Design a protein with these regions (language model features):
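All-alpha RGS (Regulator of G-protein Signaling) helical domain and cognate RGS-like helical scaffolds
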Residues: 1-156
């Protein structure tokens, strides 16, 4: 076990639960970027591929983290329900921003639940998702990772 992610007795359960939720968000993001790749305008295809690769990398790291925290990583679902139908390049961009908001929310929860290196890693992932969301949307939000909470639970 990597001592950098070893939880304290009081935070271990919360950190594991939040890491599992972040892992689930990364699984969903990978699926979503598959849909995005099929609809995105060619001018933004490279950006979508890079984001997809970053989500796969984070997913793999979270899989290891969940194990290090003593859990069994949850597998991805066979398919995910999208928040809206993706018919065009504009829809693909909107989905990408939505995905990044959701991922940022999951990492925000992990930042609150974890400590030490795991908290720093979660903060880095939150920041990266917020930057990607701002690039897709064309504008940032005041409190990345809290978007859906600020909108009263509305996520799309």
């Amino acid at each position: 076990m990597n001592p950098a992610v070893k939880p304290s007795p009081s935070s271990g359960g919360r950190a594991l639960e939040a890491a599992q939720a972040a892992l689930a968000a990364e699984h969903a993001a990978a699926y979503g970027y598959g849909v995005i790749g099929a609809r995105i305008d060619p001018a933004r295809a490279t950006e979508a591929r890079e984001a997809y690769g970053q989500h796969l990398s984070r997913r793999d790291r979270l899989t290891r983290t969940v194990r290090e925290l003593g859990g069994a990583p949850r597998p991805s679902e066979a398919a995910y329900t999208l928040p809206f139908e993706v018919r065009s390049g504009d829809d693909a961009v909107r989905l990408a921003a939505d995905i990044e908001d959701r991922v940022a929310g999951a990492y925000s929860d992990l930042v609150r639940a974890a400590d030490g290196q795991l908290r720093r890693d979660a903060a880095d992932a939150l920041s990266a998702a917020a930057v990607r969301a701002a690039r897709w949307r064309g504008v940032g939000v005041a409190f990345p990772g809290l978007t859906e909470r600020a909108e009263g639970g509305r996520t799309s």
